[in-house]
Swiss-Prot record:
Primary location: cytoplasm
Protein name stated in the entry: Polyribonucleotide nucleotidyltransferase
Keyword Ligase attached: no
Any single Gene Ontology cellular-component annotation: cytosol
Gene symbol of the encoding locus: pnp
Length: 701
């Protein structure tokens, strides 16, 4: 073994890249260590031959966090890691997005990237180390790859400015969490959430990260120069120019006309007819050219047609100019029995979004490397096949659905009230019922509307918009509110969400080099204009949160008791609190500081539980008259229950002004009587009187 090690400074961190010691049978393998806090093993394996049956590039990225990395043993019966967590899925997507466009066009060999977190001190997120390791492993593998890439996380504080690769603690105090990845001369991917930062501040963070991760790119280049394998002798298939020209001559004008059909289903039907005609006319009897080759060339003609029209200033596919948002239709309160609902329609994209309020116990329990956490806010995105007029698989959420749901969550999370102000658990579900571009941003708008409809006190309404880019040479066009086709055929997917005041989320994926600062500025400017337009139309329907919660939502009552009384409310083995919950049908959460949250399906249930707790925690007041029940009679008096769990003694001498021979002459067990509290000693024993009640009443007690 002859390991090769490169160490470099990355901001305040020391990063070590090592290859040649572990996973030597992989095409490329790198062990990344950051400050001895995080260690990630990244392997890359590439197939030498392409599968001729696949018409796409089969790249897969798997990020996995091993519990042993944090000195933990997995929970559950089997005591081993199971299916990927949401965090692992999101990080896999984060790594995939900047590397996918850097594989050469036409490269169809299967490539698998596996990033394994093998050690962590739980101070920082391992995702940046995994991205650096992926860049290094690809660079030394010999697989055709137009990298390397660098990656960085950026935080922001108004007082100190931008901070590179912050810890979890620093992120918690930051108004920005942004991950940026790209090559030495281009930004390829941005993923972020923010607390109403300006467009200039967001762009500044992107440029700051790009400058800082040049150190990563240089170190990877040095590692590849010393330990890299020879680049594969791979060449793309020779383009069949003659066939391309023939198909374009025959069908080019018809394709151009097809893209003037504004209704998606009709447009797809017409283009499908033309594609079938091209296959019938040009695919050879001997299979030369093949039907798949004709379809591929037909797709290239579609690609060029749409792009040329856009950069030459012609109307877009649906007839809009570059800055116009599709017509909006906004409704709230569309579902009668839910807590909050909205139907948001933008052109042929539609989201039915529902907000549900729950108790603290409904919060999602997350078992992460940092430990167990409770998440009181969930946003789930569903994309059924009928939304695009297709039959398809129904089942659990896929990577795309998880990613879109997280983007929508990031967009609205900063505008939610603090937990001490609004202690409900919140779940928002976005059902995409129609889709033709930017369904995730429709989910953002719908989520904001549904939350306000539910009475969640949002700090401000949130809207989102998806921008696109078509760049041909020196010509470019930035598109507002892109269609699905424009997303597929364009060079950039640029999603911005925020309030009227600032940006709350920015996601960017770029497929080409050459995206300048000027282009990003134009995109952010157009996005702001569109966002304000959408917010204006949303505010006409519901401009602020409803003042009262939905009648269907659970009632919550917050109260606080003395910490010494917690055990009284809970009871032996939890018997008391269980009894209260069973009898009132409410749920009760008690914190160590004595804070209590009562949730009831009705106000009456919550009030009943509150009164039970007040009764248990109440103290007997000297000089106050209570109506109590005789619990037990003894020779020297009677014990009367005046409060839940609190009995006092009426001495035989305090039963009547007249002489009493037997207590049973005056009282019997179960009898209700009025008693006056005479005294409570330092041991909590309560002294009661029946004979002094009339005088106390007369004196106004």
């Amino acid at each position: 073994m002859n390991p090769v090690i490169k160490t470099f400074q990355f901001g305040q961190s020391t990063v070590t890249l090592e290859t040649g010691r572990i996973a030597r049978q992989a095409t490329g393998a790198v062990l990344v260590t950051v400050d001895n806090d995080v260690t990630v093993l990244v392997t890359v394996v590439g197939a030498k031959q392409a599968d001729p049956g696949k018409g796409f590039f089969p790249l897969s990225v798997h990020y996995q966090e091993k519990t042993y990395a944090a000195g933990k043993i997995p929970g559950g019966f089997f005591k081993r890691e199971g299916r990927p967590s949401e965090k692992e899925t999101l990080t896999s997507r984060l790594i995939d997005r900047p590397i996918r466009p850097l594989f050469p066009e036409g490269f169809m060999n299967e490539v698998q990237v596996v990033c394994t977190v093998v050690s962590t001190s739980k101070k920082t997120d391992p995702d940046i180390a995994a991205m650096i390791g992926t860049s290094a492993a690809l660079a030394i593998s010999g697989i055709p790859f137009e990298g390397p890439i660098g990656a960085a996380r950026v935080a922001f504080h108004e007082s100190t400015g931008y901070l590179l690769n912050p810890t979890y603690e620093q992120l918690a105090a930051s108004s920005l969490d942004m991950v940026v990845a790209g090559t030495s001369d281009a930004v390829l991917m941005v993923e972020s959430e923010a607390q109403e930062l300006t467009e200039d501040q967001m762009l500044g963070a992107v440029l700051f990260a790009h400058d800082e991760f040049q150190a990563v790119i240089q170190a990877v280049k040095e590692l590849a120069a010393e330990a890299g394998k020879p680049t594969w002798d791979w060449k793309p298939a020779v383009a069949n120019t003659e066939l391309f020209n023939a198909i374009r001559a025959e069908f080019g004008e018809a394709v151009s006309q097809g893209y003037t059909i504004t209704v998606k289903a009709d447009r797809y039907a017409r283009l499908g007819e033309l594609r079938d005609q091209a296959v019938a006319k040009f695919s050879g009897e001997e299979g030369q050219p093949s039907a798949s080759e004709v379809k591929e060339i037909f797709g290239e003609i579609e690609y060029r047609t749409v792009r040329e029209n856009i950069v030459n200033g012609k109307p877009r596919i649906d007839g809009r100019d570059n800055k116009t948002v599709r017509p909006l239709n906004i409704e709230v309160g569309v579902l009668p029995k839910t807590h909050g609902s909205a139907l948001f329609t933008r052109g042929e994209t539609q989201a039915l979004v529902v907000a549900t309020l729950g108790t603290a116990r409904d919060a999602q329990l997350l078992d992460t490397l940092e430990g167990e956490k409770k998440d009181p806010f969930m946003l789930h995105y569903n994309f059924p096949p009928f939304s695009v007029g297709e039959c398809g698989r129904m089942g659990g959420a896929g990577r795309r659905e998880i990613g879109h749901g997280r983007l929508a969550r990031r967009s609205v999370q900063a505008m939610l009230p603090a937990a001490d102000v609004f202690p409900y658990t919140i779940r928002v579900v976005s059902e995409i019922t129609e889709s033709n571009g930017s369904s995730s941003m429709a989910s953002v708008c719908g989520a904001s509307l549904a939350l306000m409809d539910a009475g969640v006190p949002m700090k401000a309404p949130v809207a989102g918009i998806a921008m696109g880019l078509v760049k041909e040479g020196d010509k470019f066009a930035v598109l507002t509110d892109i269609l699905g086709d424009e997303d597929h055929l364009g060079d950039m997917d640029f999603k911005v969400a925020g309030t009227a005041k600032g940006v709350t989320a920015l996601q960017m994926d770029i497929k080409i080099n050459g995206i300048t600062e000027e282009i990003m500025e134009i995109a952010l400017g157009q996005a702001l204009e569109a966002r304000l337009n959408i917010l204006g139309q949303m505010n006409q329907v519901i401009g602020q949160s409803r003042t009262e919660l939905s009648a269907n939502a659970p009632t919550m009552i917050a109260m606080k008791i003395d910490t010494d009384k917690i055990r009284d409310v809970i009871g032996k083995g939890g018997a008391t609190i269980r009894a209260i919950c069973e009898e009132t049908k409410a749920s009760i959460d008690i914190e160590d500081d004595g804070s209590i949250k009562i949730f009831g399906e009705t106000k009456e249930a919550a009030d009943a539980a509150k009164q039970r707790i007040l009764g248990i925690t109440a103290e007997a007041e000297i000089g106050k008259i209570y109506v109590g029940k005789v619990e037990r009679i003894v020779d020297f008096g009677a014990f009367v229950n005046i409060l839940p769990g609190k009995d006092g003694l009426v001495h035989i001498s305090m039963l009547s002004d007249a002489r009493v021979e037997k207590v049973t002459d005056i009282l019997k067990e179960g009898q209700e009587v009025e008693v006056l509290v005479l005294d409570v000693d330092n041991r909590g024993r309560i002294k009661l009187s029946i004979k002094d009640v009339p005088a106390a009443k007369a004196s106004g007690v």
